[in-house]
Each structure stands twice: as C-alpha cells, then as structure tokens.
Regions:
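Cytosolic regulatory regions built on CNB/CRP/Popeye-like sensor folds
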Residues: 1-159
Length: 159
C-alpha cells in the first residue's frame, strides 16, 4: 500500500467520530480496490460500498471479533494494529490498510479466527445487514461480486 494511502487512512481515523460515516472520503476507494471480493466492482459500486463504512475504535487489548461468533461485518484497519489468532494457534499481525471479515458480508458464517487490538485501533466497519441492503438495491453489483468470487476460486485452484 502506498504511503499516501496509509497517510490518508490515518487522516480518516483522526477526523472522524466513533460510529460516524464519512461518505466518499477519497482514502476509502484505493483500500476497497485491494480487497479481492471487490476487485470486479466499478468505481460507482465501490463508492456505494464506501458509504456504508463507519468508524469503530478499540483500546489496546479488546477482542474485535471472536472465532466461532457469527460474522456480521467487514473491517479495514485505518490506524493501529490487530492480531489474528486461529483456534489452532497460528497468529499474524494486521496493520493500516489490512482488512478482515470480507466473506462475512456474504455468508454470515462463524468467524474462523479471533482478532484483537494490539494497540489503539481505528477501523472502518461495514455491516453485513447494510451490505446486503445495498445488494438488494443494486442487483448488477451482485453479478459483479459473483465474477470476483469466481476469480478468487480460480486463483485458489492454481495454488
């Protein structure tokens, strides 16, 4: 991710209040474009997805999502770091511009890992309910997402 994009994300986090929706902030689109699920979406669709994002802040330590809990949102890290831990003990750290929970937008399946704040953490959160509402309003977007999912599956089959 470019330094300009990381800087823009930190700026978003600093300028927003908890729960506030910062519509069409220019920093959102490049971040959403990096998410494999959204790669097939056009700019207009990405802007509609970006409008759904709300700021959510966490102090150091708290769990953001717990393994086994129903997936109800997608998160992009705007500032700070988070730790992902799978039930079998594998861990990895996420930082500005990283994201998690994107498949929860579609299926609401149980979370595969626990994610907790390593330090003060600011995220953009998109709820599954809001996202599904957008898909009902924009059926063409659902078709594009299906194309993106096919690409993801093909890439996995090559690996």
């Amino acid at each position: 991710m470019s330094p300009q994009c990381v800087s823009a994300m930190k700026g978003i986090a600093e300028s927003m209040q908890e729960g506030e929706n910062r519509q069409l902030h220019p920093g959102w689109i490049p971040v959403l474009e990096r998410v494999p699920l959204f790669k097939a979406l056009n700019k207009r669709h990405l802007k509609r997805v970006a409008r759904l994002a709300e700021l959510k802040r966490y102090k150091s330590g708290p769990i953001v999502v717990r393994a086994g809990a129903r997936g109800d949102a997608f998160f992009v890290i705007l500032d700070g770091s988070a730790r992902v831990e799978t039930p079998d003990g594998h861990t990895r750290d996420l930082h500005e511009g990283d994201y998690f929970g994107e498949l929860a937008l579609l299926d609401g399946a149980p979370r595969s890992a626990t994610v907790s704040a390593i330090n003060s953490l600011a995220t953009a959160r998109i709820s599954r309910t809001a996202f599904l509402g957008l898909l009902r309003d924009e059926p063409a977007m659902g078709v594009r997402l299906a194309h993106g999912l096919v690409d993801i599956v093909r890439d996995l089959q090559k690996a």
